[in-house]
Each structure stands twice: as C-alpha cells, then as structure tokens.
Amino acid sequence: MKKVLLSAAMATAFFGMAAANAADTNVGGGQVNFFGKVTDVSCTVSVNGQGSDANVYLSPVTLTEVKAAAADTYLKPKSFTIDVSDCQAADGTKQDDVSKLGVNWTGGNLLAGATAKQQGYLANTEAAGAQNIQLVLSTDNATALTNKIIPGDSTQPKAAGDASAVQDGARFTYYVGYATSTPTTVTTGVVNSYATYEITYQ
C-alpha cells in the first residue's frame, strides 16, 4: 500500500515538473536517490506472512502503565517473525544450510541524539503523535531490554533461526515494544516508526 501511494505521488510530482518545463526550461533541479545491492544468494522472505515489507501492530499502552514503569522499561512487546526460505545461488544452486542464515538490522528512524540506554530507540515518525516515547527492537520480551537491538550496530544480538518452522529455511522471531527514558513526560497519541533489515547467508 505505501509503495503504491509513493509511486502515485512521484508520478504526480514528475508530471507537474514536465508541465512547468513547458513554460520555462530552467526551473531548477534536484537529486533522486536509488538503493540496490548485488548478492550471490537470493531467498524468499516473509515478515508475519506479508512479504519482505510488512506492518506490525502493537497493543496500545496507557499513560498509567507508562508512568508506573521505571525509565527504559520494555512495555507491551509484540512478537513478529521473519521467515526465510528457498535460498539459491546466482547459478540456481540450492543453498540449504540454514545454519548460515541470519537477519541483520541495518537502520531505521533512530532517535536523534540518543545516549546511553536510548541507543537503538526508534523515534516516532508522527510529529503530531505521542511525545517522548519510542519503539525498540529486541530478540526477546524481557522488560529489562537486555537483548535490545541497535540497528546498524555490528554487535547487535541475533535471533536464532528455527529450521523446524519453515520448509527449506528458518524462522527468526523478534519483538518490538515501547520504551521511554522520561515516563512522566509522555503524552497520548499514535506511535509509529520503522526499521530496515537484510538477510545474510554466510
């Protein structure tokens, strides 16, 4: 859904630029960023059964629950799964050693200026949403966030793949939940964010 809307918006933007150029050929310019990668192994990936891109919906957390918890407590963690299967090399050779599979969190909407325990916190993308509360990834649901994931950090904890859950592949289970370093300053509203990942075979 988001990709379709973005494509429609881009088409509109380019159409508007073409119309302007008909009247004035010197109207400025800009930069378009493209991202890609060449790999020697490809796999089928499904997050919560939705494909490689997905939405994960958390249960709401109340202000009472937030303010009753200590700072940086993991609140209402929600589990989600990443299934990886049918890996093949560039020449079509099946790559079926699931012990080589892994998930690496590469980035996201990280909280700007984060220090200490806030490292890895994913900032709210909704400017008019809840304030002073973030989302956090982890490999478990422990309230102490002992296995917090910092996207982009090479030392991030890794979820173990469950080969019994996916044919010719493995299932990786992760959690996402709320956290805040300042519980008393949190306000009500929507909390949305995102993180990016890549599948590794090594």
UniProtKB/Swiss-Prot annotation:
Gene Ontology cellular component terms for the protein in this record: pilus
InterPro entries cross-referenced by the UniProt entry: Adhesion_dom_fimbrial (IPR000259), Adhesion_dom_fimbrial_sf (IPR036937), Adhesion_dom_sf (IPR008966), Bact_Fimbrial_Adh_Pro (IPR050263)
Signal peptide (from-to): 1-22
Highest taxon listed in the record's lineage: Bacteria
Keywords: Disulfide bond, Fimbrium, Signal
Main location: other
UniProt key word Isomerase: no
Protein's GO biological process: cell adhesion involved in single-species biofilm formation
One of the Pfam families matching this protein, by short name: Fimbrial
Intracellular or extracellular location(s): Fimbrium
Gene3D superfamilies: Fimbrial-type adhesion domain (2.60.40.1090)
Disulfide cross-links: C43-C87
Family to which the UniProt record says this protein belongs: Belongs to the fimbrial protein family.
Name the UniProt record assigns to this protein: Fimbrial subunit type 3
Species the sequence originates in: Klebsiella pneumoniae
Recorded name of the encoding gene: mrkA
